Amino acid sequence: MQEFLLPVIKSALQSAAIETDKPVQIEKPTDKKNGDFSTNIALLLSKECRRNPRELAAELIGQMIFPDGTVERIEIAGPGFINFYLTPLFIMQSVEHILLEGKGYGSSCAGKGKTAIVEYVSANPTGPLTIGRGRGGVLGDCIANLLATQGYGLTREYYFNDAGRQMQILGESVRYRYMERCGRDIVFPESHYQGEYIREIAEILFLEHESSLIDSDNLSIFKDTAEAIIFSSIKKTLARIDIRHDSFFNEHTLYIAEGNGKSANDRVLELLESKGFIDRYDGATWFLTTKLGQEKDKVLVKSSGEPSYRLPDIAYHLDKYRRKFDLIVNVFGADHIDEYPDVLEALRILGHDTSKMRVAINQFVTTTVDGETVKMSTRKGNADLLDELIDDVGADATRLFFIMRSKDSHLNFDIELAKKQSKDNPVFYLQYAHARICSLLRIAAEEAGFKPDGSGAHLLQKLTLEPEIQLGFTLLDYPEVIRTAIRLLEPQKMVEYLHSVAEQYHKFYQECPILKADPDIRTARLFLSLATRQVLRNGFTILGISAPESM
């Protein structure tokens, strides 16, 4: 909402003959005594203007021209802050626009004509999805939803790690269990995949082929069968929490020779070598990151001839640039912290604009019950499984709990709290606010003939009580919260904001009688409730949680 102040302040600077490259900063004070909005522009410019900041602030205020009925007063505070106090009339007139825009409230055309790719989950198809991957999946999905509100042409991509040593180990693990199922005595390697799901895949192969594969040297049938079954399972798990991708990029394509006889991986090595950043020693091929100030060079091809993760990752990101996206967002787990800077350095060396690539790294997840760490799985190996978490707490709680803390913070997922039907549970608290409004509107329609068609929305201008104005003012923050969440790649900002909306609404509901108020005030408060419901619904859509109409 502060956007309406910006042109007025800039015009005042022009009228005062002040030219500056410094951006005008407008903030929302935490203490309402300091206004609805505040700017420190006079403090920022006092030195270069050689003026006392309070005197400069007074001059700028004298040059400010606002439309009638928008700003109640302007004050100079402290060393030179300019504080703006809006009129209740202007706030409530602005709330009317929420009702007019409906589902589109908070959306913009900032990304119109631009394309963005968000890569998230990208788990190896070597086992069921873990809770840690689930957190990254929800984070990425919410970031994609945020970008969608700004009009970007969006690609939601899953990088399918179907090459490399881990896939070989998967195939070997299934073959060992298959041989065991055929009655052969084996010693199962500790380094291989231990989960019960490996036995289940082996059983499928046994039912189809009986013992005919027991002496087969063809590892592919074991690996490919496991890969197909596991990846199908991964997709089903993600769908349970409404995560779907529209693009899947297979890692193995980076190893396939193209028309010139070179693979994408080969091309990376050639390009980096042409820039003087490749050397070969100790039997391996190295990325000379010491030339970039790092302590050690990084292996791109091991002495065994197998590429390290860095080489195909660089090739994959070069492909993203080849596809000419305007914005590239990667959502990684904390295990990528050491690796992705090398990918960025390689892209810079090869002449690509890395400012268009942004990385969101989410920290680890621990599940707890009564403060004690627990494992979600006792059956399928030593892992916390996402499916079992969803079974236990449901899809909505799974999604919201994953993003209610900053991605930069370790998350303690409190299982008991996620199942509580009380205001202590943030999912329940948010959804209860929405359900309460729906119930109120049903009763109002039955008892007072209220119709949410907008014909009485102008009566919002009659509202002047503090809980009403504060709720309306909070609703007007929604578009800015979206922009902030995108800028920080932090959907948690949306969770915090919606919690504030719910909190403000519950206060308004308790302190301002609605159904028993005079007809005009009743109608106005119902429309304020309707606007609140719209903001909650729009926010729930971004977060990917349901909006129940009764609880």
From Swiss-Prot:
Gene (UniProt): argS
Cystine residue pairs: none
Quaternary structure and partners: Monomer.
Record protein name field: Arginine--tRNA ligase
Keywords associated with the record: Aminoacyl-tRNA synthetase, ATP-binding, Cytoplasm, Ligase, Nucleotide-binding, Protein biosynthesis
Source organism of the structure: Chlorobium limicola (strain DSM 245 / NBRC 103803 / 6330)
Single GO biological process annotation from the record: arginyl-tRNA aminoacylation
Superkingdom, natural source: Bacteria
GO MF annotation, one: ATP binding
GO cellular component, one term: cytoplasm
Chain ranges for the short sequence motif 'HIGH' region as given in the UniProt record: 123-133
Catalytic activity: tRNA(Arg) + L-arginine + ATP = L-arginyl-tRNA(Arg) + AMP + diphosphate
